[in-house]
Each structure stands twice: as C-alpha cells, then as structure tokens.
Amino acid sequence: MRGLGLMSGTSADGVDAAVLDLAVAGCGGYRGVFTHAFEPALRTEVLAANGPLGVEAMAQLDRRLGACYARVAREAVDRLGPVDFIALHGQTIRHQPRGEPGFTLQIGAAADIAVATGLTVVHDFRRTDVAAGGEGAPLVPPFHQYCFQDEQPRLVLNLGGMANVTWLPGTGDPRPLLAFDCGPGNVLMDAAVELCSAGQATCDVDGRLAAAGQCDVVRLEEWLDHVFFRQAPPKSTGRETFGMPLVTRWWSSWRGSAADFLATLTALTAESVARAVRAWTPGAAEMLVFGGGAENQALMQALQDAMKETRVLHGGRHSGIPGQALEALAFAWLGSQCLLGKRLDLERVTGAQHPMILGNILPGDNWPDLLVQLSQQPEITAREGPYRALRSV
C-alpha cells in the first residue's frame, strides 16, 4: 500500500508531497518528494488568514487551497507513481488548544481533492487529538520512532515554522518517547526578513544575514523570558503566539541593524531548543535536524554552540530522507494508521487523555478497491518488534 502525504506548514511557503510505501518498514519506504511553492497571491492570502477573517473569505480560501492541493497531488502521482490514498494535513489557520474550548483548524477542501483525483483522502488529524484532550501537536513523533529509533537514545528536531523536538528511547528501553513544541523555528526569522526587506524577501537564505550580525545577549534573555518557554510539556504553539505581530513589536524598539536583529532571532530559536531539551528530556548524544531550518547554516551552528554535549546532524544527509519530505511522509504514515483502525497513544506527546484513531476518511472513487486491499494488509508496525505507541482497536 502506497500513501501520498500532503503537507503545508506554518511558514506557508508551499506544499510538500511525498510518497511512502508501507510494504517497506521505516525509512526504506520513502519513494520520493515533490515540492510546489504557493503562488505569491495565495501565500499572501494564507498569511492574512492568521488575522480576522470572515466566514465567506475563509470558505473561499478553503476551496482555493483544495484546488492547489489537488493539482499538487495529480502532479506528484505523475512524477512519483500511483498511490492508494492521500493523507492531507491541510493549512493551519488557527491553533489554540488551550482555549475554552480549545481548538485547532486546518483547511484545504479534502472533498475537492477526492473528487479531482478519485482517491480516498484521510484528513483532519489534529482535531481528533484535541477532542481527546491533547494539544493537537506535535503529531509527527510516532513516525520519528518508526523511522529513527536506534540502539541509543536520539533526539529528532523539526525546524519548520515552529520547532518541535522528539526524544526517542534506545531500543529495549521501556521509557516512552517524549515530544513537544519548543517554540519558534523559522517563523520569527522569516517574518523579520519580510519586514526588514519591505516584502522583497521571505527568508534568510543559508542564514547569511544572521551570520553578518551580532547577537544582542541582553535582548535575547528578555525574549527568552516569554511565558511559553517556561511552560512544561505537553505544549504546542503557533503563529498566534510567535508571528509577525510579535516581530513587529520587537523591531519597533530595536536600535541595532537588521543583521543584528536576525542574529538575535536566530539565537532565540537555537537557545530555546537547547534549554527545552535540557529541561524536559533525558538528552542524547546526537540530534537529527529536519525542516527548512536545517538548511540555515547560521542556525545549525547556533544549535551546535548551544548544545555542546550533543552532536547536531543534518537529518536529511544522515538518513537519506530529504528534510522537506519528512512531515509529508509522517502524515502518509498517520493516514495508513487511520485506515487500518490503529489507535495512537500520545499521552506523553500531546497530552491526549486516551488513545485515539487520528483522522477522518473521505472515500474516493477507489474506496471499494482500497477496502479490499486493507482487508489483506498485514499490520504495519515499527521494524520487527511491537510498536509501543500503537494499540489495535
């Protein structure tokens, strides 16, 4: 069984489409990735949706994103080969799991994708976790364990818009995995570049701007006093907490150069990760780094400087899975678990109060054939042993 994962994150830079072959365990199931950048007008609309947005505008954006995802899915199949289902993360518009009531919202018209492709779509993963009392994020850590668990404990860091870290116990270690959001990944740096360039640039390519500046350690400590960094896991965050309004406020009182501002924001991401790892995990000798932040040389160096006891490795080069593929692959795997009726126990990850089957299934034209295939599917577990985070229904 082959799944296509579609992922667009809080950076809102585009869609990653990756194929996972579930017949092969772990990283060996990776079959390729295709990335489609959002058109500038759509990206602007997505970013604007983080502010007040009317029902009609939200509904129209939902359909426009669905049309974009459908085009990406068709092109991914053309490039990477046929698949049996699509797993859609969608575009996060709001993430406030600690509200009254808490909620998270991802949009992207899954029905449009199913109709356009004829394929069954699994979607809406995060709201199931929130319904079970969880944060709705991070959801990728079980896939980290499926792919990257080793004899010794290991850390896996994803540097997308937000930064989230997973601590994996060594094989045979009875301790459960731990995972949580550390705070901002690329989101504040990207916002600062956009602000300082008057919209002419959207990211600090290779960390060159930050590398040309000096970190303001006084401001850094002020920013690290943010309440989120003091909060114990399980915890998750989003643009509502770390986004353009925060960067605009900090920039308005900044007296140094733009390069120094970028250098200090880069240090903020690195130091917040390092402090979170020391405070809330048992630590590990190595950490695999994925996501767009892994391509930022200034950020990778800042991480290594802040975590001298841990070897910081580029996850894509170390594992053979490109950084832009990891989250899309994870959702393809999560989609397979939903189709197979597998419960995920995420108590030590999101704080969910009991195991749940994550996701909703929207049958496509291939649904009857997929049902037959699912009835013949062996259980998909991690490597040779039982996967501790899975429980059969």
UniProtKB/Swiss-Prot annotation:
Enzyme Commission designation: 2.7.1.170
Top-level taxon in the UniProt lineage: Bacteria
Positions contributing to ATP binding: G9, T10, S11, A12, D13, G14, V15, D16
Catalyses which reaction(s): 1,6-anhydro-N-acetyl-beta-muramate + ATP + H2O = N-acetyl-D-muramate 6-phosphate + ADP + H(+)
Record keywords, A-Z: ATP-binding, Carbohydrate metabolism, Kinase, Nucleotide-binding, Transferase
InterPro entries linked to this entry: Anhydro_N_Ac-Mur_kinase, ATPase_NBD
Any GO BP annotation: amino sugar metabolic process
Pathway, per record: Amino-sugar metabolism; 1,6-anhydro-N-acetylmuramate degradation; Cell wall biogenesis; peptidoglycan recycling
A single GO molecular function term of this UniProt record: phosphotransferase activity, alcohol group as acceptor
Protein family according to the UniProt entry: Belongs to the anhydro-N-acetylmuramic acid kinase family.
Function: Catalyzes the specific phosphorylation of 1,6-anhydro-N-acetylmuramic acid (anhMurNAc) with the simultaneous cleavage of the 1,6-anhydro ring, generating MurNAc-6-P. Is required for the utilization of anhMurNAc either imported from the medium or derived from its own cell wall murein, and thus plays a role in cell wall recycling.
Annotated protein name in UniProt: Anhydro-N-acetylmuramic acid kinase
Taxonomic source organism: Acidithiobacillus ferrooxidans (strain ATCC 23270 / DSM 14882 / CIP 104768 / NCIMB 8455) (Ferrobacillus ferrooxidans (strain ATCC 23270))
